[in-house]
């Protein structure tokens, strides 16, 4: 399977660089996985696509203002993008600088906080913050929202609210679980009133989510690792939902990766730790019956995940139609509602 199999042409003007006026103001492309049929809707129409007893699973991670600026004690300027909170005083981070800092060197942040570079772990740097503060406090005070590269603008005050789900409670992500950005409190209440169950998992989205697949043969791709948690309570809800003949609906590919990681032994079980699950065509889904997701970058692992869910041909056709109908793409863009194609795992890509 080649990386280029997942390529498509996207006009630059279809990349959404700002959110819609309201969270639910996006369009919704419905893809029936088994048949490939498409229907053009508005996001609030999701209420009519779910049924009483269905279980919607959301990722409750919260984006931290992970981008900060500073300089080395020697004077050279640099940019830090936190990747993972290790503990109250330590983070793993990407450091952009003309010359990489060495272990033991001091970085002075824009508010005067002095941070020590402790060690290098391949492309990431371990940074230690002073004992009289916490890494999260410093980031919350002076950090910028880590907007994706393709948004191609500086973050603004509005992004602190809109590049964040309304239900995110667990701080630690450096990228938003973007399917969740479309939900507001009113829609969540309407779903609940309809009898749709809601459950929450946690996956702290890392900057690696934007890393391109660089190898031609996708089987040679090394997937990035992210921290996740699926509780016993969520597992019990999933089992009860399945037993009642209802659907498990994942909100976002991060929720998919959580649930499918937790079910690697065939049955969903509590899980806390790292996941580097790579889902591509041929994968047999074990938990997820339907998916709410945004449109993903060409040749990305997330487009491969969707292709494995709905079928390669159905997915690529849906993307062609979305381009033709001028849907808005990527993090601040429009969404899809997709039902699972159980035959997708048998599909050959030629």
From Swiss-Prot:
One annotated Gene Ontology cellular component of this protein: cytoplasm
Enzyme class: transferase
GO molecular function, one term: S-adenosylmethionine:tRNA ribosyltransferase-isomerase activity
Gene3D superfamilies per the UniProt record, alphabetical: QueA-like (3.40.1780.10)
EC number(s) on file: 2.4.99.17
Protein keywords: Cytoplasm, Queuosine biosynthesis, S-adenosyl-L-methionine, Transferase
First-listed, main subcellular location of the protein, grouped into a coarse class: cytoplasm
GO biological process: queuosine biosynthetic process; tRNA wobble guanine modification
Pathway this chain belongs to: tRNA modification; tRNA-queuosine biosynthesis
Catalytic reaction list: 7-aminomethyl-7-carbaguanosine(34) in tRNA + S-adenosyl-L-methionine = epoxyqueuosine(34) in tRNA + adenine + L-methionine + 2 H(+)
Compartments reported by the entry: Cytoplasm
Purpose of the protein: Transfers and isomerizes the ribose moiety from AdoMet to the 7-aminomethyl group of 7-deazaguanine (preQ1-tRNA) to give epoxyqueuosine (oQ-tRNA).
NCBIfam families: PRK00147.1, queA
Self-association and partners: Monomer.
Family affiliation: Belongs to the QueA family.
Protein name: S-adenosylmethionine:tRNA ribosyltransferase-isomerase
Gene that this polypeptide is encoded by: queA
